[in-house]
From Swiss-Prot:
Its job: Poly(ADP-ribose) glycohydrolase that degrades poly(ADP-ribose) by hydrolyzing the ribose-ribose bonds present in poly(ADP-ribose). PARG acts both as an endo- and exoglycosidase, releasing poly(ADP-ribose) of different length as well as ADP-ribose monomers. It is however unable to cleave the ester bond between the terminal ADP-ribose and ADP-ribosylated residues, leaving proteins that are mono-ADP-ribosylated. Poly(ADP-ribose) is synthesized after DNA damage is only present transiently and is rapidly degraded by PARG.
Catalytic site positions: 733, 751-752
Gene expressing this chain: Parg
The protein's name in its UniProt record: Poly(ADP-ribose) glycohydrolase
E.C. numbers: 3.2.1.143
Region (A-domain) residue spans: 1-452
Length: 972
C-alpha cells in the first residue's frame, strides 16, 4: 500500500487574471500549444474589422473590459495527494488532445457545405458556437448579422438548384474533417467562460476571413449598440431554422468550464457565478485525501476522483450539464417552428418584388462565420460563374446606405423547389429523432448517506448461523485445546509440549532445535550452537538505553550489524518520549515483552502451517499465542526471514521489525506508539480470545456475461470509516498482495493503519504467501487496541481503545476482515480492458463469497475506494465492480467514500438507475465491455472523452428504446 515514488507534492499553476498574474497575449503561441494563429494571404483579407471590446452587448466573461478579472480559463492541476482526494497527472498535451476530441463533434456539424471563398481559402479559420441566443458577436455587431443573412439568401434560379441542395445535404458532416484538419479552432470548452485573450483570437480569425469592407463598419460604437437588437432579430429569422436543425444534428454536449480544484476561484470576481448551481460549484468542495505510502504498499484509498479523469468524470456525470443540454435542445426546436413560418412570409415577399422588377437579380454576398455557422444548410454550391464572390467595397457601401430590407436581396425560388425543400426538411427532422438523455435525479446536498439505512443491513452475529463445534481437521489447524475453551479464560495450547517441525510446509520457529548459529568454542573452533540460547542471553540483559536494545538484537543478527539502521528507534526513545515514559518503557513494557517472547516454546507448541498459494486452509490460534509471536517479530528473532531476492521466504512478507527501526520518518514514532500500546495491553492483561486466518482460493467463477443475479441493497456515505461504522460486517482491507503492505516499514495508508490498530493482523505476514489472482485472506476475531487521527503523514496515535465487539461461539470477536489486492494500473485506460475488469471482479468475488452459507446468513460488505489512489484505479469503476461482485455473492454493500460527497451521489444514482431498470449483473458487465470497445480501445488520449457513468446511462437508455421496437437488438 504505497503511494509509490510517483506521488510527489504538486504546486498549483498560476491562474490568469489572479492577483499579480496577467493573461498571456493571444499572439503568444507558447501559451496555447497547438493553437497558433493562421494568417491568410493579405490579398484574401484586404480589410480587417474589430468589434469594440467595450460594447455593452458583449456577454460578460467572453470578451469585454474585464481583462483583469478572473477568467474561466481553468488549467488541469497536477495530482494533489491530500486528505480527501487524489488526482491523477494530466499533461498539457493530453489536455489539448482531449479538448480537440470534445470540440470536433459539435464543430463538424457547423462547417458550411460550400466553399464560400474562391480566393484560395482552404481552411475555415474559426467556427462559431451553435448557441445562437448567447453569441456575443451576434449581440454586439449588426454588420455581422447582415452579412450572415445575406449568406443565407444566396439562391440560384435554375430548377436543378433543388437537386443540388438535396444531394449536398449529407456532406455537412463528411466534408467537415477535411476543413477542420488544420483549422485554428478554439479548443477551450464551449461555455460562458471564454477568456478575453481567447475571444480576441477568435475575432482576429474572423476578420482575416473577411475580404470585403462593409459600409456599416464605419459606424460609431454607440450606433452599433443602438441598432444591434433590432438588426439581430431581423437577420436571425431565416438563419435560425437551419441553425436549430444543425444543432440537433451535432448533438452538442457542453462540458463544464470548471475543474475540481478551481470552483472557489471561478466564483470570485466573475459575473457568471450566478449561473453556477450548487452541484457545479461543489465539485471541489471536499478537501482532498492525502495518500502516502512506500513502494511495498502502493494501495491507497481514493476519492474519487483519484485522478484527473475522475474529476472529468464528475464533470460529465453532473446532472447540471445534462439539464443545460436539454434546454438547448428545446430552444432549438422552438426556433425551428418560428423560423419555418417566417421563411414562408419572406418567400411571398420575394415573389412580389421579383415580379415587379421583371428581371433576375444576381447578387453575390460574402458569408462571414462570425455569428451563425448553422445557416450553411441553405447554401449549396452554385455552378458556373455564379459561384464567384466578386463584391467590392463600393457595392457594400451602397447596400448599407440604402438600409433596405434584407428580403430585397432574395432571388426568386421556384415553387417546385419550395416543395422539395419542405419535404427535405421533414425527412431530415424525422431521421433526427434522438433518444432523450438520462438525467440523474437531483439529490439533497445535505444528505450524509443515501440508500438503505445502515441499521437494516445484516450484521454478525445476529445474521449468522450457529457455528459448529471447533475441531481441527485436514483443512483447519487449531493450536489450542478446544475441549477446555471457556469464555473469559486464556485458552490452553495444544499439544501440551512443544513439537518442532523444520520443513518447507511450516513456519521455522526461533525456538527450534534446528535454528543453529555458528559460534566459537574455547579452542577457537567454529561449531554450530543453538541460536535460541543466544537470543535468550541477549534479551535477558537490562535495557536502559536504546543502544542496549540495538546491541541485543544485533548479537543474534551479526550478518546485518552493518546493514540495519536503528535511527527511528533511538530518536523515539531519546526525542519523542518524556523521561517518565521512557523509564516506563525500559523498566516495564520491554521486560514484559521479553518475557512473553521467550515463552514461545511453552505458548506456541504446535507447528504453524504455511498458507501457501492454491491452498484452502484455516489456522485458529489464541490471542496470547499471537502476542508471543509478535514480540519475537519485534526483537527480530525469526530465522531465514531477512534475506531478499530468491531466498526461501522471498514470496512471503517481512515479519521482523528491523525496517520499522530505520530512518527518520515522522511516521515511525506514531507507529511505535501504536504498537507499544498493544504490547502494554496484552502483557498487563492476557487476552482470552481466538483468531482464525483463512486462505481462500477459488477455481470456479461466474460467467459474468450470463450472470442473471440482480443487484443487492446499497448504503453509501461520505462519513465514517470501515472499522468504525462497519462493525459486524465483512470489512475490506485494500491489501497489497503481500498482506500488510508496508506496516513494518514506512507505509501508513488504509491497510497499514488497520494492521496497526488491530496488530494481531500482522502475524498473518508470518505464514501467508503472496496472494494470487484468485485468492484472498480472511481474518476473523482480531481486536482493536488503539484509536488514531489523520492519515499517512498526518497519522497520530490518539488513545487506547477498548473493543466492545460481541464474541461468537469460538470466542472470536465478531470482526471479519478480508484482504483483497487490486491491480496496479500505470495507464488509466488499462483498467477497462476486459481481462482486467474480469480479474478485479473475480478477486472481489473471491473475497465476498462464502461457499455453502445461505444469503440471509451473510453480513453486508463494508468497503470503499478499493484499488484507487496510488494504484491508479477509477473510483466509479471500482465501486461498480464491487457492486457486481457482491451481487454475485448475494451480499449487500455498505460503501464509504471517505469524505467525497460527489462520489457518494454518483454511486447512489448509478445503483438506483440500474435497479429501477432491472439490469442484472450480466447486463451491466456487457455494458462495461461495450464501453471498452467504443470508448477506450481506440482512444489515443490518456482518458476517454465519455466517462463511464454517462456512457452507461446513455447506452442503457438506448438499449431500452431499441428493445421497445420489434426486430431490434439491444446492443448490450
Amino acid at each position: 500500500m504505497s503511494a509509490g515514488p510517483g506521488c510527489e507534492p504538486c504546486t498549483k499553476r498560476p491562474r490568469w487574471g489572479a492577483a499579480g498574474t496577467s493573461a498571456p497575449t493571444a499572439s503568444d503561441s507558447r501559451s496555447f500549444p497547438g493553437r497558433q494563429k493562421r494568417v491568410l494571404d493579405p490579398k484574401d483579407a484586404p480589410v480587417q474589422f474589430r468589434v469594440p471590446p467595450s460594447s455593452s452587448a458583449c456577454v460578460s466573461g467572453r470578451a469585454g473590459p474585464h481583462r483583469g478579472s478572473v477568467t474561466s480559463f481553468v488549467f488541469k492541476q497536477k495530482p494533489i495527494t491530500t486528505w480527501m482526494d487524489t488526482k491523477g497527472p494530466k499533461t498539457a498535451e493530453s489536455e489539448s488532445k482531449e479538448n480537440n476530441n470534445t470540440r470536433t463533434d459539435p464543430m463538424m456539424s457547423s462547417v458550411q457545405k460550400d466553399n464560400f471563398y474562391p480566393h484560395k481559402v482552404e481552411k475555415l479559420g474559426n467556427v462559431p458556437q451553435l448557441n445562437l441566443d448567447k453569441s456575443p458577436t451576434e449581440k454586439s455587431t449588426p454588420y455581422l448579422n447582415q452579412q450572415q443573412t445575406a449568406g443565407v439568401c444566396k439562391w440560384h434560379s435554375a430548377g436543378e438548384r433543388a437537386e443540388q441542395l438535396s444531394a449536398s445535404e449529407p456532406s455537412a458532416v463528411t466534408q467537415a474533417p477535411k476543413q477542420l484538419s488544420n483549422a485554428n479552432i478554439d479548443q477551450s470548452p464551449p461555455t460562458d467562460g471564454h477568456s478575453d485573450t481567447d475571444h480576441e483570437e477568435d475575432r482576429d480569425n474572423q476578420q482575416f476571413l473577411t475580404p470585403v469592407k462593409l459600409a456599416n463598419a464605419k459606424q460609431t460604437v454607440g450606433d452599433g449598440q443602438a441598432r444591434s437588437n433590432c438588426k439581430c432579430s431581423a437577420s436571425c429569422q431565416c438563419g435560425q431554422d437551419c441553425a436549430g436543425c444543425q444543432r440537433e444534428e451535432a448533438d452538442v454536449i457542453p462540458e463544464s468550464p470548471l475543474s475540481d480544484v478551481g470552483a472557489e476561484d471561478i466564483g470570485t470576481g466573475s459575473k457568471n457565478d450566478n449561473k453556477l448551481t450548487g452541484q457545479e460549484s461543489g465539485l471541489g468542495d471536499s478537501p482532498p485525501f492525502e495518500k502516502e505510502s512506500e513502494p511495498e504498499s502502493p494501495m491507497d484509498v481514493d476519492n474519487s476522483k483519484t485522478s484527473c479523469q475522475d474529476s472529468e468524470a464528475d464533470e460529465e456525470a453532473s446532472p447540471v450539464f445534462d439539464e443545460q443540454d436539454d434546454q438547448d435542445d428545446r430552444s432549438s426546436q422552438t426556433a425551428n417552428k418560428l423560423s419555418s413560418r417566417q421563411a414562408r412570409e419572406v418567400d411571398g415577399d420575394l415573389r412580389k418584388r421579383y415580379l415587379t422588377k421583371g428581371s433576375e437579380i444576381r447578387l453575390h454576398f460574402q458569408f462571414e462565420g462570425g455569428s451563425n455557422a448553422g445557416t450553411s444548410d441553405l447554401n449549396a454550391k452554385p455552378s458556373g460563374n455564379s459561384s464567384s464572390l466578386n463584391v467590392d467595397g463600393r457595392s457594400s457601401k451602397q447596400h448599407g446606405k440604402r438600409d433596405s430590407k434584407i428580403t430585397d436581396h432574395f432571388v426568386r425560388i421556384p415553387k417546385s423547389e419550395d416543395k422539395r425543400k419542405e419535404q427535405c426538411e421533414v425527412r431530415h427532422q424525422r431521421a433526427e429523432r434522438k433518444i432523450p438523455k438520462y438525467v440523474p435525479p437531483n439529490l439533497p446536498p445535505d444528505k450524509k448517506w443515501l440508500g438503505t439505512p445502515i441499521e437494516e443491513m445484516r450484521k454478525m452475529p445476529r445474521c449468522g448461523v450457529r457455528l459448529p463445534l471447533l475441531r481441527p481437521s485436514a483443512s483447519h489447524t487449531v493450536t489450542v485445546r478446544v475441549d477446555l475453551l471457556r469464555a473469559g479464560e486464556v485458552p490452553k495450547p495444544f499439544p501440551t509440549h512443544y513439537k518442532d517441525l523444520w520443513d518447507n510446509k511450516h513456519v521455522k520457529m526461533p525456538c527450534s532445535e534446528q535454528n543453529l548459529y555458528p559460534v566459537e568454542d574455547e579452542n577457537g573452533e567454529r561449531t554450530a550452537g543453538s541460536r535460541w540460547e543466544l537470543i535468550q542471553t541477549a534479551l535477558l540483559n537490562k535495557f536502559t538505553r536504546p543502544q542496549n536494545l540495538k546491541d541485543a538484537i544485533l548479537k543474534y543478527n551479526v550478518a546485518y550489524s552493518k546493514k540495519w539502521d536503528f535511527t527511528a528507534l533511538v530518536d523515539f526513545w531519546d526525542k519523542v518520549l518524556e523521561e517518565a515514559e521512557a523509564q516506563h518503557l525500559y523498566q516495564s513494557i520491554l521486560p514484559d515483552m521479553v518475557k512473553i517472547a521467550l515463552c514461545l516454546p511453552n505458548i506456541c507448541t504446535q507447528p504453524i502451517p504455511l498458507l501457501k498459494q492454491k491452498m484452502n486452509h484455516s489456522v485458529t490460534m489464541s490471542q496470547e499465542q499471537i502476542a508471543s509471536l509478535l514480540a519475537n517479530a519485534f526483537f527480530c528473532t525469526f530465522p531465514r526471514r531477512n534475506a531478499k531476492m530468491k531466498s526461501e521466504y522471498s514470496s512471503y512478507p517481512d515479519i521482523n521489525f528491523n525496517r520499522l527501526f530505520e530512518g527518520r520518518s515522522s511516521r515511525k514514532p506514531e507507529k511505535l506508539k501504536t504498537l507499544f500500546c498493544y504490547f502494554r495491553r496484552v502483557t498487563e492483561k492476557k487476552p482470552t480470545g481466538l483468531v482464525t486466518f483463512t486462505r481462500q482460493s477459488l477455481e470456479d467463477f461466474p460467467e459474468w456475461e450470463r450472470c442473471d443475479k440482480p443487484l443487492t441493497r446499497l448504503h453509501v456515505t461520505y462519513e465514517g470509516t470501515i472499522e468504525g461504522n462497519g462493525r459486524g460486517m465483512l470489512q475490506v482491507d485494500f491489501a497489497n498482495r503481500f498482506v500488510g503492505g508496508g506496516v513494518t516499514g514506512a507505509g501508513l495508508v488504509q491497510e497499514e493503519i488497520r494492521f496497526l490498530i488491530n496488530p494481531e493482523l500482522i502475524v498473518s505476514r508470518l505464514f501467508t504467501e503472496v496472494l494470487d489472482h484468485n485468492e484472498c485472506l480472511i481474518i476473523t476475531g482480531t481486536e482493536q487496541y488503539s484509536e488514531y487521527t489523520g492519515y499517512a503523514e498526518t497519522y497520530r496515535w490518539a488513545r487506547s481503545h477498548e473493543d466492545g465487539s460481541e464474541k461468537d461461539d469460538w470466542q472470536r470477536c465478531c470482526t471479519e476482515i478480508v484482504a483483497i489486492d487490486a491491480l496496479h494500473f500505470r495507464r488509466y485506460l488499462d483498467q477497462f480492458v476486459p481481462e482486467k475488469v474480469r480479474r478485479e471482479l473475480n478477486k472481489a468475488y473471491c473475497g465476498f463469497l462464502r461457499p455453502g452459507v445461505p444469503p440471509e446468513n451473510l453480513s453486508a460488505v463494508a468497503t470503499g475506494n478499493w484499488g484507487c489512489g496510488a494504484f491508479g484505479g477509477d473510483a466509479r469503476l471500482k465501486a461498480l465492480i464491487q457492486l457486481l461482485a457482491a451481487a454475485a455473492a448475494e451480499r449487500d454493500v455498505v460503501y464509504f467514500t471517505f469524505g467525497d460527497s460527489e462520489l457518494m451521489r454518483d454511486i447512489y444514482s448509478m445503483h438506483t438507475f440500474l435497479t429501477e431498470r432491472k439490469l442484472n449483473v450480466g447486463k451491466v458487465y456487457r455494458l462495461l465491455l461495450r464501453y471498452y470497445r467504443e470508448e477506450c480501445r481506440d482512444c489515443s488520449s490518456p482518458g476517454p472523452d465519455t466517462k463511464l457513468y454517462p456512457f452507461i446511462y446513455h447506452a442503457a437508455e438506448s438499449s431500452a428504446e431499441t428493445s421497445d421496437q420489434p426486430g431490434q437488438r439491444t446492443g448490450t
